[in-house]
Amino acid sequence: EADKSIYDKINSKLTLIDNVKVYDRNKNVYIESNNLIYDQVENTIYSHGKTLIKIDDIYEINSKDMLYDRNSMRLSSKQDTIIEDNKLNIYNFEQGFLFDTIKEIISSKKTNITDSSNNNYSFENTKINLKTNEIVGKELRIDFIDSFFGNEKNDPKLSGKSAYTDDDKTKVFKTVFSTCNMINKSCRGWELQSEEFTHDKTKKLFEYKNSWLKVFNKKL
């Protein structure tokens, strides 16, 4: 569906212009854009400008200049992209992304995630397995909601050089963690540094290996 269509017989390409709406029934993929090009030879769809894609009523993707390969069922873009799922998680991908919709794996250079509890996670060189809820990445930073550890006056943050997380546990390496209030934003009261940090989500336990505590501007 579109206001205007142009078919190039020589190159076997169909261009759809303005108010474009495409529903791929075989793949259960819905696309909205103002300019789409369907390449029959390559079996690909390329969008120019803002694009909305919905997959299986599970994922909603907002991006620009997207490539949809119908053979491999891969979506990609070099532009900033936001993906929302039906579990209220929001994935913000900077500098583009690649989404293998069959394996449900997303790769991105820079990733920001806001989970359903409103905690914020930042990664670099990330791979996300949406089937298993596994995330692997580098340069992790987590901004927890202030009340995450039971005190709304806290400002809990955690950072690490690399990380792995799934439904059962989160493991972060070379970690810096603090729950101290940062009213003046100039310096934390304390921070805990660890070679390895593990959060057992089932047992609700935190484990630290090779750790040391730093206290700032305090007399002990």
Where are these regions (language model features)?
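Structural signature for solvent-exposed beta-strand/loop edge elements and short helix-capping sites
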Residues: E1-L220
